């Protein structure tokens, strides 16, 4: 009996798909995608023109424009991420750019998934079984409650809709001089307050100031699940966050073994066999509790059967528990999955997504009216 409402909705949706209104909605979505492509082209071209005008170290503006036309790459991807300037066309085609991945995400990631993952509190509530730390909203507590929360443990303050580590800072009670102004700042900015957790010792020693999270990229639908790739993100320079945008470094993890077999890399394509600050070896490092981390991702993916893509940020804690920190419904493929080894994953993505989703996701990149049926995620 429980499946009857779902069956009824599916039947009604099938009827709706035969109507002229549905076709018009798909046409609107296609026009939106076309607009996005043109805007990307303008922005990327302007950035590249400025960089080449300053004296770019490699390649040429003409070659970049050709790469942009064919593969929708940014200047960063062309110059540093994938080093397109040194590749022939066959080698370039092995990579999938961030813009191409975003095109896929727009078309097949559902609105429910987007809304859940974009809002940090909605995510924490939906995936509560995998979150062990305390948290609260600054604008949802009094001054006294705010102070008691901070005095109980160090706190990380985050914007609700922040990305790339922007706007994140750490609060230590011993360093607070004006509680009222700090509370007002957090409350007025609607910041999320989270208890600071400690990673297990092997992870922590890499860079003690930051948590050093593990990003696991998964593909899933229903009971189907696979780990597509993973990387260890480490802070640097004493930063409390481990994002590359804040100067952090990252290293790809072998999904089969949980080991790091190759050097880490930063946003400027510098490679590190040892951490640049602590000198702790990175190559040969084995992620503690790797099997439990993968199993946590598998269980979390089942919470939303139509999740499809996810980038899970996790960390094994000092007590052995696996802590889910954040999630991303549109994980980057341009970082740890392709850049460190300069090896493209386009064909691997086609094969893995075909097994999980039953479609050729590379077809979703093509901007033709023939792909109208793939624009449902934008409605």
Regions found by a protein language model. Name each.
Residues 224-225, 258-260, 321-322:
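Hydrophobic residues embedded in beta-strands of well-ordered beta-sheets
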Residues 1-36:
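Intrinsically disordered, low-structural-confidence terminal and linker regions
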Residues 155, 226-228, 323:
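Protein kinase-like catalytic core scaffold
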Residues 103-223:
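Active-site nucleotide/adenylate-binding loops and adjacent lid/helix of ATP-dependent enzymes
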Residues 24-149, 297:
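Conserved N-proximal alpha/beta basic substrate-recognition cap immediately N-terminal to
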Residues 163, 234, 330-332:
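Short, surface-exposed beta-strand-loop junctions and turns on beta-sheet-rich folds
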Residues 6, 10, 14, 273-292, ...:
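C-terminal active-site "lid" helix and adjoining low-complexity regulatory extension at the edge
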Residues 197, 201-207, 229, 233-317:
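A long amphipathic alpha-helix within ATP-dependent nucleotide-binding catalytic cores
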